[in-house]
């Protein structure tokens, strides 16, 4: 579930050596499954361990994860990196904002996961987003653009060369195309 590099493990052991005996770490997600999700690591003294915590054993310490955070920490990695500017602990949790869906989930759930975890973060740099409206019987994903994408002069290129290409590669036997149903209104909100 959570991978902690050897350098990060050594860093945690060093930090925990200054704490009361029996103290471990807690890895958590605040507001999991939302766009505001934030991950964190804190000390976890013995009296803060909950009955529904999942405990992961590492070299010299354990990591506790609460039941609510657990599904959002799938594939999370913690590393301790050093460069010219100094050292820092990095925590990457690709599923923190949206729970990873299983391979047998419905097509719309799997497409929605890709939209939220991969496509919308890219569109967010232009203040835009898309949402899945429906999937037609013909296998066409009907999308609606929002934010800076609404009225953008590049929306057709984004749709055909970006989003449609990506979704067709990921769901080749299930999707046949992508359609935009947005009533585009160019305005101050539009990118470009």
Curated annotation (Swiss-Prot):
[4Fe-4S] cluster binds at residues 149, 152. Coiled coil: none annotated. Its cofactor is [4Fe-4S] cluster. Gene3D superfamilies: Fe-S cluster assembly (FSCA) (3.30.300.130), HesB-like domain (2.60.300.12). GO terms for biological process: iron-sulfur cluster assembly; protein maturation. Keywords: 4Fe-4S, Iron, Iron-sulfur, Metal-binding. Disulfide bonds: none annotated. One of its GO terms (molecular function) is iron ion binding. Binds 1 [4Fe-4S] cluster per subunit. The cluster is presumably bound at the interface of two monomers. Homodimer. Involved in iron-sulfur cluster biogenesis. Binds a 4Fe-4S cluster, can transfer this cluster to apoproteins, and thereby intervenes in the maturation of Fe/S proteins. Could also act as a scaffold/chaperone for damaged Fe/S proteins. Belongs to the NfuA family. This is Fe/S biogenesis protein NfuA.
């Amino acid at each position: 579930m959570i991978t902690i590099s050897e350098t990060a493990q050594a860093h945690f052991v060093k930090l925990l050596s200054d704490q009361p005996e029996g103290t471990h770490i807690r890895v958590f997600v605040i507001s999991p499954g939302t766009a505001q999700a934030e991950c964190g690591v804190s000390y976890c003294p013995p009296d803060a361990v909950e009955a529904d915590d999942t405990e992961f054993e590492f070299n010299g310490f354990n990591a506790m994860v609460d039941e609510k955070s657990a599904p959002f920490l799938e594939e999370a990695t913690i590393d301790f990196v050093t460069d010219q500017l100094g050292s820092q602990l990095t925590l990457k949790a690709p599923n923190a904002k949206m729970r990873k869906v299983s391979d047998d989930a419905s097509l719309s759930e799997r497409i929605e996961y890709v939209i939220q975890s991969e496509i919308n973060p890219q569109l967010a740099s232009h203040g835009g987003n898309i949402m899945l409206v429906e999937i037609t019987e013909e296998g066409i994903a009907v999308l609606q653009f929002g934010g800076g994408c609404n009225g953008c002069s590049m929306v057709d290129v984004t749709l055909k060369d970006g989003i449609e290409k990506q979704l067709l590669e990921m769901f080749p036997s299930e999707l046949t195309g992508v359609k935009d149903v947005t009533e585009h209104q160019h305005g101050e909100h539009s990118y470009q």
